[in-house]
Amino acid sequence: MEEAVGELSARERDILRLVADGHTNEEIGEKVDLSALTVKSHLARITRKLGTGDRAHMVALGIRSGVIN
């Protein structure tokens, strides 16, 4: 699964980092100038690419792969 992190787009990586910082979808949207619904769509794609079921697992994979430090 950690290899799958390499398949994330730059935007998806940015969103993953903001999730790791504890931001809500609305807060992430404000920071990257997207709607909360678009952020939710990005998170769904990240979840699918990584095969994760929740934000905590998504963040753990990001940390282990070095995307999040």
Predicted regions and their residues:
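A cross-family signal for key residues in well-ordered alpha-helices
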Residues: R17, E30, A60, N69
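Short helix-to-turn junction characteristic of helix-turn-helix DNA-binding domains
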Residues: V19-H23, G62
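Regulatory hinge/linker segments at domain boundaries
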Residues: M1-D14
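Short alpha-helical "packing" element that flanks the helix-turn-helix/winged-helix DNA-binding module
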Residues: E12-I15, V19, M58
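Recognition helix of helix-turn-helix DNA-binding domains
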Residues: T24-H57
